[in-house]
């Protein structure tokens, strides 16, 4: 609805004033500007917290910072995705701090906290992926029984978060889809996310399975999502080295991981791999930016020919994100959302 209103150039503001705060602890293009677009559309001004330039650098606590930035703030968006066991915990700490501030009368309103990607999940991204599937296949009811291959793919870089594949297997299994997770041995996701994917599949009537063969996952798939990620053990080791300030250890770990990735350089979504999919014409999805062979790198996640065929689809996929974020904020802030939406139309 919000996207349609935007296309019709109709406003959908719900705030007359106030701030939205973004905290990015990792690089971002799509999510950063999607958050900015969402809060602007809702009527908020945007301020980005630079932790290096704030008193956090001098030891200010999360509890104090969260309250100090929230006096006129309606929403806080956080990306903290690089370190297993850290990102989601930090978001909960911020949420608890501002809840306490609101309950004790320090804050006049309790800001919504939006997960812009953590160590466990990337909800705004995978919801955008889901909306693309809903529109592509013609409705929610048509997703049931569709096979999606969430596959690791080769990348010439290391240290990519686990949150996108974890988010995909835990969202698509809720819609009765047949989700296949493929990765080489050693590139495991967090155990709790695997366990929950099995549970969601059982509840929805779909299925969830794992394989160490990319070809098996692609066989007769309706959707493919080839993306690189770092082994869970590597991310955990990286976190320890960063906390210890061990720069030499980090360099050695990077070299080890790049060499390990090289063993699986043939894990690429190319034309031959796509021929294995249903009618050789599965929908390709990616959170972007993709590592495109002979474009952004010599060898990568996806062949140039495949990416070019689906490029506009991936852009449309990304285009849902501002409205996903806006909807999250809208639903958390509007007491009668249906009536409010009707007032916009």
Task: Annotate each predicted stretch with a short phrase.
Residues 25-37, 134-240, 244-248:
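Glycine-rich phosphate/diphosphate-binding loop of Rossmann-like nucleotide-binding domains
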Residues 1-13:
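An N-terminal, well-structured beta->alpha segment
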Residues 199-303:
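Rossmann-like adenosine-cofactor binding region
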Residues 277-345:
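Adenosine-phosphate binding glycine-rich loop
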Residues 13-23, 27-134:
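Phosphate/diphosphate ligand-binding glycine-rich loop within oxidoreductases
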Residues 142-144, 173, 272-281, 309:
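Short, conserved loop/helix-junction motifs that constitute active-site signature segments
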Residues 104-111, 177, 276-285:
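A short helix->loop->beta-strand "cap" motif at the edges of active sites that frequently abuts
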């Amino acid at each position: 609805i919000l996207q349609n209103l935007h296309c019709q150039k109709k406003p959908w503001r719900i705030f007359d004033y106030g701030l939205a705060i973004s905290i990015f602890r990792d690089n971002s293009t799509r999510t950063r500007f999607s958050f900015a677009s969402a809060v602007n559309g809702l009527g908020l001004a945007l301020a980005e917290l630079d932790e290096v330039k704030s008193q956090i650098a001098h030891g200010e606590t999360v509890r104090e910072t969260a309250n100090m930035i929230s006096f006129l703030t309606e929403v806080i968006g956080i990306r903290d995705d690089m370190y297993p066991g850290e990102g989601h915990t930090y978001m909960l700490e911020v949420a608890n701090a501002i809840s306490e501030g609101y309950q004790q009368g320090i804050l006049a309103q309790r800001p919504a906290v939006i997960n812009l990607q953590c160590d466990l999940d990337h909800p705004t991204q995978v919801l955008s992926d889901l909306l693309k599937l809903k529109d592509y296949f013609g409705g929610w009811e048509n997703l049931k029984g569709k096979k999606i291959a969430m596959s690791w793919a080769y990348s010439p870089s290391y240290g990519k978060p686990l949150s996108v594949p974890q988010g995909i297997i835990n969202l698509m299994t809720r819609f009765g889809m047949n989700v296949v997770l493929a990765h080489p041995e050693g590139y495991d996701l967090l155990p709790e996310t695997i366990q929950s994917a099995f549970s969601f599949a059982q509840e929805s009537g779909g299925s969830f399975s794992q394989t160490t063969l990319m070809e098996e996952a692609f066989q007769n798939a309706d959707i493919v999502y080839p993306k690189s990620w770092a082994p869970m053990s590597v991310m955990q080791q990286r976190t320890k080295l960063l906390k210890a300030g061990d720069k030499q250890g980090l360099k050695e770990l990077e070299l080890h991981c790049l060499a390990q990735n090289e063993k699986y350089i043939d894990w690429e979504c190319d034309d031959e791999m796509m021929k294995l999919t249903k009618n050789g014409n599965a929908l390709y999805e990616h959170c972007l930016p993709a590592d495109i062979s002979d474009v952004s790198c010599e060898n990568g996640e996806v062949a140039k020919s495949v990416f070019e065929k689906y490029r506009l689809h991936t852009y449309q996929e990304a285009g849902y994100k501002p409205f996903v974020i806006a909807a999250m904020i809208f639903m958390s802030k509007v007491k009668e959302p249906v009536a409010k939406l009707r007032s916009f139309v």
